[in-house]
Structures are given as C-alpha cells and as structure tokens.
C-alpha cells in the first residue's frame, strides 16, 4: 500500500519562508528518501514554532531526520522491497535528542537543530545505506539534523534560539522506532516501505 502526501513548496522545504530550490535535488527527478519522523509530544513544540513563524499548516512529514537520499532507479526500487534491505537495516530502536540551533550557511541557507543524542546511530544507519546503495545524492558530508527552515531571517533564527536552545533534555527527546522509505520528486512524498526497529 502506498500513500501520497501532497505538500506546498513551503511545507515541503520545512521552511517558514519561501525557500530557494534545494542544492541537492534536481528538478524532474525522483529520489529515495529514508527518514525518521520526529514523533511524540515534543514534536508539537517544533510544529507550533513552524506554524507560528510560517502561518498555516505544517505537514507532519516536514519534521524528520533524513537518514539517506539518492536518485531512485528501477533496480533501487526493487532493492528497497527486498528482504536483504530489511536485514541490512536490522537496527535497535533508540532515543534521539536535539540540541541547539545551528546553520549550514554558507553552503545552503538551512537552519537546523543538531543532535546531541542519536547522532551516532543515525550515522551508522546512513553508512549501512551507503554501503548498500552508494554515496547518495548529497554533495556534502552527512550531518543528522532536524531542519527548522530554509531562508530564515536573522530575527527568526534568534527567535528559534530563544525557544529551543534552553529547553530541558526531556523536552528535546524523541524515540526512533521506525524508518520510513519514501519516493520523493520535490513535491509529493509516496511512502514505499516502513521498517520497524526492534
């Protein structure tokens, strides 16, 4: 069973402002995106901040940690559905915790929450996927993170720091118990597979 989630460009970029085009995604191409949703009570704070800054709804898929991204081919599609794929990603569930507001500038205009806990686990899963499918679409090193927005103003970044940097650890923690595989073309996310972590 597949589901397609349509999002506006604003929601898709997780951006409270009109975002520039992604430096990684090429128009007209389809990608495999393996992500972990930020779930539980603590995601509400993130979604509320995005909603307040952006106005309007924030799609649930917008708050996640990208684990791996690569251009989708027919052979890759078959590999994702295979039992080998499940075996390679046989990983225990883990706790993750976001830290302070950081930026990828000047490489790209993305502000994000770094990961204080769970970073090593995300990096290990990413490396398993690199070993299976190759380096992927990103032209820069993998940094597990939760995107706050793209093209934010300095005022918005300062506000994000006020809201997120001082939160106690229990309000920044979430459980990673599933990985979600999506086919993504820059606008629509079509769920291909959900992998429960044990």
Predicted regions and their residues:
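Basic, often amphipathic N-terminal segments
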Residues: 2-95, 103, 118-172, 189-198
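Short histidine-centered catalytic/ligand-binding loop motif
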Residues: 110-118
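Active-site/acyl-donor-binding loops of N-acyltransferases
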Residues: 182
